[in-house]
Amino acid sequence: MHRSTTALVLCLAPMAISATHSASAGPDLATRLQVHGFASQAAVHTSENRWLGDSPDTSTEFTELGVNASLRLSPRLLVSGQILSRRAGDMYDGAPALDYGLADLKLLYSDAYRLGLRLGRLKNPLGLYNETRDMPFTRPGIFLPQAVYFDKVRNLVLSSDGVMAYGELYRGFGSLAFDLVAGRPLIDDNVEWAYLNQDFAGDLDIDGVSWLGGIWYSSLAERFKLGLSWADLRLAFDPDAGAPFTIGPGQTDILYWIASFQYNAEDWTLSAEYAREPIEWR
């Protein structure tokens, strides 16, 4: 049986709003405060794929709106955040939510290196596109490859509440960078359907601290980029007492990793990623 999906997206380019200031606000507020936004609207025609819900024909329920701001409080400290509204079929209803909100502290920095900490709701540094996956003009296509960036569990891999250590070393051959996150990713009903195949009576939540990280190499001018990123987390299910038709308590261990490659030419980019996600239920 022939199945097909056709998509069209209308993207509004990034909007930048300069901060106005008065004498009492300080003459440099406009250089320290930045506000940006983006918007996109897609139309999807599919035969029988049921893309993100019951959409067998044509659907326009694919809208993304984002507003973000950052304020540099000092040469070492930056605070930033983003509110995102995302409508995607039956899975996301467009309710505004905090996408990220963090404080970024530079511990050490020079022309040769930088080392810092981020605290708050963090975008998980997984693969080439996870941190910017909701900005349509950063994606390689209308939708990201679902083998690597599975939208059904998007919230689980998108961001975490926790702390991140990051660093970068600049040399004549390019740069080496690392990220290490300790925190708690976000859980929603879509995650339970994806890993347990049903919305059972009970609670599915993150068990303990989850660890995420990545190491990256970029050549001069970022012509080549190579990276390996990973997430190690555990989901625990606690069934409701006396509930019929449920499963017993248990844990799902997930080790998710992505190998990434990118080549940037003047007029085109070649990207390739390979992902594995071994899962163990016990």
What are these regions (language model features)?
Residues M1-D28, G141:
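Cleavable N-terminal export/targeting peptides
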Residues A19-R32, R50-W51, E192:
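Cleaved targeting-peptide boundary
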Residues P27-V35, A42-H45, P56-D188, Y217-L220:
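Outer membrane beta-barrel
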Residues Q34, F38-T60, L228-L233, F237-T252:
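Outer-membrane beta-barrel transmembrane domain signature of Gram-negative proteins
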Residues D90, K106-L117, V153-R282:
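Signature for the C-terminal beta-barrel architecture of outer-membrane proteins
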